[in-house]
């Protein structure tokens, strides 16, 4: 029976999960919920089902795989990574994966807080000044490695790709000074299953955020 992945009909937190499902050639169906337009941003499509799915902490995204019902995006990613042995082979790789996972969440939240802020246009110039240092740290951490944990693909490469790509959309020149990050993105996009997925009708590159955001690269 196919797994069921539930989320809004946007890129959002589920982009790395969708790509990992595709990369592992997993059998899954998507339940995509649609949010209403302004000013109400009606969420009844999701709210009508929220407490009927048997989820311990009802939220989006969720993944249902037989008797396993999982919420929290990183918990879903880690579950899939363990299932397909993409969570690092050595302690050093697992440590690096843990660091990147949490660093990506910080970097993502900073962009989210800006894009949903009513003062988006006023705060954007100052935010742009902080991007080079963020990218510099990712570049130094990656170094000459092909992947963020080491020599092999792990689940955190899906997270890292997603956030670096979002920042590249937000500020197209932000990776100009970091050739290893640009090479990483190209390497990831060149993975056979990922390349095929990105060309398919199932792929959602944008909008990144919900209709409530002031920037979503629509």
UniProtKB/Swiss-Prot annotation:
Keyword Transferase (UniProt): yes
Binding site for glutathione: 7-8, 43-46, 50, 59-60, 72-73
UniProt EC number: 2.5.1.18
Pfam families membership: GST_C (PF00043), GST_N (PF02798)
Modified residues (Phosphoserine): 67, 210
Domain (GST N-terminal): residue spans on this chain: 2-88
UniProt similarity note: Belongs to the GST superfamily. Mu family.
Function: Conjugation of reduced glutathione to a wide number of exogenous and endogenous hydrophobic electrophiles. Involved in the formation of glutathione conjugates of both prostaglandin A2 (PGA2) and prostaglandin J2 (PGJ2). Participates in the formation of novel hepoxilin regioisomers.
UniProt name for this protein: Glutathione S-transferase Mu 1
């Amino acid at each position: 029976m196919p797994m069921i992945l539930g989320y809004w009909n946007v890129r959002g937190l589920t982009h790395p999960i969708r790509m990992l499902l595709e990369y592992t050639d997993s059998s899954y169906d998507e339940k995509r919920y649609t949010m209403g337009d302004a000013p109400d941003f009606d969420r009844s499509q999701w709210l009508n089902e929220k407490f009927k799915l048997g989820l311990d902490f009802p939220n989006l995204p969720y993944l249902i795989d037989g008797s396993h019902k999982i919420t929290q995006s990183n918990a879903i990613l880690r579950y899939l990574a363990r299932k397909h042995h993409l969570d690092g082979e050595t302690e050093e790789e697992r440590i690096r994966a843990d660091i990147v996972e949490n660093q990506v969440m910080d970097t993502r939240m900073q962009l989210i807080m800006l894009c949903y802020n009513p003062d988006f246009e006023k705060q954007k110039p100052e935010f742009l000044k902080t991007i080079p240092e963020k990218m510099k740290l990712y570049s130094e951490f990656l170094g000459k490695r092909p992947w963020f944990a080491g020599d092999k693909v792990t689940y955190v490469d899906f997270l890292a790709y997603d956030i670096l790509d979002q920042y590249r959309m937000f500020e197209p020149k932000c990776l100009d000074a970091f050739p290893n990050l640009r090479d990483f993105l190209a390497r990831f996009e060149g993975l056979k299953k990922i390349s095929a997925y990105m060309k398919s009708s199932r792929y959602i590159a944008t909008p990144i955020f919900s209709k409530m955001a002031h920037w979503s690269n629509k």
